[in-house]
Amino acid sequence: MYENVFVIDHPLIQHKISLIRDENTGSKEFRELVGEIAMLMAYEVTRDLPLEEIEVKTPIAVAKTKVIAGKKLGIIPILRAGLVMADGMLKLIPTAKVGHIGIYRDPETLKPVEYYCKLPSDIAERDLIVVDPMLATGGSASAAIHFLKERGAQSIKLVNLIAAPEGIKAVHKDHPEVPIYVASIDQGLNEHGYIVPGLGDAGDRLFGTK
């Protein structure tokens, strides 16, 4: 359906997506579920990591085994909703470095503005995973990827729980080489820019704000 877009349809992920869509799911359970889904998605997102063979001594004999080789990983949550996804992924890849990008839309120009950015100093040497629960218009995600490229990033993946077709098209128009990993592609956006059926405002539901 879309090039360079991967829908992760594992039964556990799809079950948990159903739970976070439910308006009756409270903030505590919502946070836990988002972290769990992100951790499960990380398994697929990192499937193409290169391996190298090493030898280790077991209590019985020397074994030839494999470890991750090549570039190190970096997780970049888009503030604020991406934070919980980053925490979930860190449970699976605890050695990854974490950077943060904060973006808002200028009300007059409607262009994304970076208000916060703290990144590992060696991002050019890392495979970066940008995380944000929702890919709606694609403006924030595309801007975040642009800002990372400006700072030397060479390898970037985007991971979202739920995406709208409009967001996917916008990101791939600006960054066609960036793969997008999602748990669901929904119908589209409503007049307020929310994904339909979506799950509402992920940030508000994660942190109990309105």
Swiss-Prot record:
GO MF, one example: magnesium ion binding
Binding site for 5-phospho-alpha-D-ribose 1-diphosphate: R80, R105, D132, P133, M134, L135, A136, T137, G138, G139, S140, D201
Keyword entries, A-Z: Allosteric enzyme, Glycosyltransferase, GTP-binding, Magnesium, Nucleotide-binding, Transferase
Taxonomy, superkingdom: Bacteria
Enzyme type, top EC level: transferase
Cofactor needs: Mg(2+)
Binding site for uracil: I195, G200, D201, A202
Modulation of this protein's activity: Allosterically activated by GTP.
Reactions catalysed: UMP + diphosphate = 5-phospho-alpha-D-ribose 1-diphosphate + uracil
Entry's EC annotation: 2.4.2.9
Cofactor note: Binds 1 Mg(2+) ion per subunit. The magnesium is bound as Mg-PRPP.
Gene3D superfamilies xrefs: 3.40.50.2020
GO biological process assignments: UMP salvage; uracil salvage
Keyword hit for Lipid biosynthesis: no
Pfam name, any one: UPRTase
InterPro entries linked: PRibTrfase_dom, PRTase-like, Upp_B, UPRTase/APRTase, Ura_phspho_trans
Protein role: Catalyzes the conversion of uracil and 5-phospho-alpha-D-ribose 1-diphosphate (PRPP) to UMP and diphosphate.
Family of the protein in this entry: Belongs to the UPRTase family.
UniProt cross-references to PANTHER family, sorted A to Z: ADENINE PHOSPHORIBOSYLTRANSFERASE (PTHR32315), URACIL PHOSPHORIBOSYLTRANSFERASE, CHLOROPLASTIC (PTHR32315:SF4)
Protein name: Uracil phosphoribosyltransferase
Lineage: Bacteria, Bacillati, Bacillota, Clostridia, Thermoanaerobacterales
